[in-house]
A protein has these predicted regions:
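Primarily recognizes the serine-hydrolase "nucleophile elbow" in alpha/beta-hydrolase
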Residues: 164-213
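Alpha/beta-hydrolase
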Residues: 86-88, 199, 262
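Alpha/beta-hydrolase active-site loop
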Residues: 134-160
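A domain-start/cap signature at the N-terminus of enzymes
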Residues: 27-82, 246-248, 254, 287-288
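Tryptophan (W) side chains
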Residues: 3-5
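Short substrate-entry loop that stabilizes the transition state in hydrolases
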Residues: 76-127
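Bacterial N-terminal signal peptides
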Residues: 13-22
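C-terminal catalytic histidine-bearing segment of alpha/beta-hydrolase fold enzymes
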Residues: 220-230, 244-288
Length: 288
């Protein structure tokens, strides 16, 4: 390998880094974003020193100011409105860094892509899944208060949000958080999102079905009962029966709910299912 080749590779790497970081505008909760900062592909980090630690920070022991991440689509225009596509990851949820799965699903178009961290009142090491499992009963208050503050800041920062078509989705513990918000949220939170996506989670927490009426719901779950699925063979084998009852309850309450069985999949959503989610989202966005 020649030194010229190495030098050229280093230059390309530095140029790529500069191009990417040039779009990132770090904004604290006290600052305001200028309209000139909102451009195609721009990235915003909003920080919230007044909010409690995220579940990621609690679990990792890393001291970090709670934050969220927003990515503007590549087809952004200040003359058009775009819905939020909020995505919540599973497990500890991460630190709220990076644009989130929504950007990948929508191929970086047509939405503001938001990555929120997860919140939990406290971690009980003796609890399910090493104490990380989110539940509406225990964590509803802290989740709703944190997300209310975060969404209000997003709306203060970005003027052209299409609230009528907002989407919020989550995987596993993230889906638990989405349902917790719907089960315990006030009228402000309930009015923000017309569409929700539940991936491998949240289904068993849906109790007040009337709160989901008039919303679009997409739920996905895997059918794989192999040993690599950490939820366990018994839980996976019982899931189709539970999901059948869930679908029946959704129909009874006249919910606009669509289910997708992810074939040969355990506790995951492989990228091959992105197109199914994108097509569903596009149908929701086309509604008046």
């Amino acid at each position: 390998m020649s030194w010229d080749w190495r030098f050229c590779s280093l230059v390309r790497l530095l140029l790529t880094f500069c191009l990417v970081t040039a779009f990132v505008q770090v904004v604290s909760a006290q600052d305001a974003v200028r309209s000139s900062d909102l451009k195609p592909g721009a990235r915003l980090i909003l920080k919230f020193p007044e909010l409690p630690q995220s579940l990621y920070a609690m679990q990792s022991g890393k001291e970090a100011t709670t934050q969220l991440y927003v990515a503007l689509p590549e087809n952004y225009s200040p003359d058009r409105k775009y819905p939020l596509f909020v995505f919540l990851y599973g497990g500890h949820g991460g630190p709220g860094a990076g644009p989130g799965r929504g950007r990948e699903i929508m191929e970086n178009k047509d939405c503001f892509f938001v990555n929120l961290p997860l919140f939990k009142k406290q971690i009980d090491a003796d609890g399910p899944f090493k104490g990380l499992l989110i539940s509406p009963e225990n964590d509803g208050d802290v989740i709703c208060k944190a997300y209310s503050a975060m969404f209000k800041k997003i709306y203060e920062t970005i003027p052209n949000i299409d609230t009528r078509h907002n989407i919020i989705g989550g995987m596993s513990n993230g889906a638990h958080s989405v349902v917790t918000m719907f089960e315990h949220g006030d009228s402000y939170l309930m009015g923000l999102f017309q569409n929700l996506i539940l991936i491998e989670g949240g289904f068993n927490y849906v109790k007040i079905f009337s709160r989901y009426q008039g919303k679009g719901m997409l739920y996905l779950y895997g059918d794989y009962a192999g040993q690599d699925d950490w939820t366990g063979r018994k839980m996976r084998e019982d899931l189709p029966k539970f999901m059948k009852k869930f679908a029946e309850s959704a129909a009874t309450y006249h919910l606009d709910a669509t289910g997708i069985v992810m074939a040969n999949t355990g506790h995951d959503m492989p990228t091959r299912f992105n197109v199914d989610v994108m097509n569903w989202v596009l149908k929701q966005l086309a509604k008046s």
